[in-house]
A protein has these predicted regions:
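Ribonuclease/tRNase effector modules and their secretory precursors
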Residues: 1-94
């Protein structure tokens, strides 16, 4: 999966900062150096589905990032947070 650009909505940036303590630069690093993409659900528009990517930031945090993969290869960020225990264990077994 090739991502050419990341789309940030102001409300999402705010939510990531106050609720999940995740910075935009961390999300962009995970998307630029993905370990595993996983289909999450069908999107509202045909061909624009929701995916989750699991990866590690430069600082060593393990993040799960949800995004809509757009037709033009852009990623519209929906959410991001630290991986939970089950995700972290699965990530370690890649």
């Amino acid at each position: 999966m090739r991502i050419t650009n990341v789309i940030w909505l102001p409300d999402i940036v705010d939510k990531l900062a106050w609720k999940h303590r995740v910075a935009t630069i961390e999300v962009e690093h995970v998307l630029a150096h993905p370990t595993r993409f996983k289909f999450a659900e069908l999107g509202r528009h045909h061909g624009e589905d929701v995916y989750v990517v699991f990866g590690q930031t430069e600082a060593g945090r393990y993040l799960a990032v949800w995004f809509i993969y757009k037709f033009n290869q852009e990623a519209l960020i929906l959410s991001a947070r630290e991986m939970d225990g089950k995700e972290r264990n699965s990530y370690g077994k890649k």
